[in-house]
């Protein structure tokens, strides 16, 4: 459903995708789509599954359990949120699904970043052996721009994991693998703290500021449009989760007031 429909339509109509025999299909529902993509990942291939935010509700069973089984080939779950409900019955925030499943999340702020993040997401997924949730919003999903493209990489060959017991979440397996997932959270936090998509701008740690901004995803673009050279406001850009706690503490310590700009409903994530 919109605003995610256009992604699959573009892939199916793209000449390069056809030339490379990229397999793209519609599924009965989001849970089925999630399971198909997860199966491709188990076989060693990279897979992308796209849905809108309310589709995450339907896919939740397979989505949450995929974090416990883990992945083989890189798996990216793209959730297209719809703030202000342009074509949806609610405006839920899919980032909470990523937090609930305890997996990495990415939120691009521009078309170029969305392009670059996809390769980064697959690499991160294969490194951590976890699915990666990428959140986009309507204003980004319904936009186009020229981007600087990277070289085309060789596709993953079929390489199924020969040890398959962990794919079956009987309690004996699930308990152990859930603990493994909990232990991975430090690696997720480390990846977020070192992420090229989370960074501070215009903040000198030796000075105190009256005002600072934390901008998430496309909110960063809105801040930069409103900013001028005379403002001198420090900005923390956040596009990878878990939240970069150390950078947030720096902002809180150095700024009297901190404004958070994000495309989100009334609830919000907190750094403790």
Residue positions per predicted region:
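Conserved small/polar residues in nucleotide/adenosyl-binding loops
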Residues: 267-272
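Core nucleotide-handling region used for phosphoryl-transfer chemistry
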Residues: 229-255
């Amino acid at each position: 459903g919109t605003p995610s429909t256009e992604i699959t339509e573009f892939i199916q109509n793209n000449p390069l995708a056809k030339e490379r025999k990229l397999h793209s299909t519609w599924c009965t529902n989001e849970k089925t789509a999630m399971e198909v993509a997860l199966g491709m990942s188990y076989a060693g291939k990279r897979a992308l599954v796209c849905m809108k935010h309310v589709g995450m509700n339907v896919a939740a069973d397979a989505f949450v359990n995929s974090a416990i089984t883990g992945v083989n080939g890189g798996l990216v779950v793209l959730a297209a949120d719809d703030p202000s409900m342009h074509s949806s019955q609610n405006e839920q925030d899919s980032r909470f699904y990523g937090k609930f499943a305890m997996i990495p999340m990415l939120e691009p702020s521009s078309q170029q970043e969305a392009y670059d993040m996809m390769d980064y997401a697959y690499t991160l997924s294969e490194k951590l052996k976890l699915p990666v949730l990428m959140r986009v919003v309507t204003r980004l999903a319904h936009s186009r721009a020229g981007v600087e493209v990277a070289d085309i990489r060789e596709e993953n060959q079929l390489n199924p994991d020969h040890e398959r017991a962990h794919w079956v979440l009987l309690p004996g397996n699930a308990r152990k693998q859930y603990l493994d997932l909990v232990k991975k959270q430090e690696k997720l936090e480390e990846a977020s703290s070192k992420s090229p998509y989370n960074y501070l701008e215009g903040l000198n740690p030796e000075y105190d500021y009256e005002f600072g901004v934390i901008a998430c995803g496309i909110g960063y673009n809105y801040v930069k449009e409103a900013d001028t050279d005379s403002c001198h406001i420090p900005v923390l850009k956040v596009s990878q989760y878990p939240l970069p706690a150390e950078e947030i503490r720096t902002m809180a310590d150095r700024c009297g007031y901190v404004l958070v700009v994000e495309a989100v409903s009334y609830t919000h994530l907190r750094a403790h």
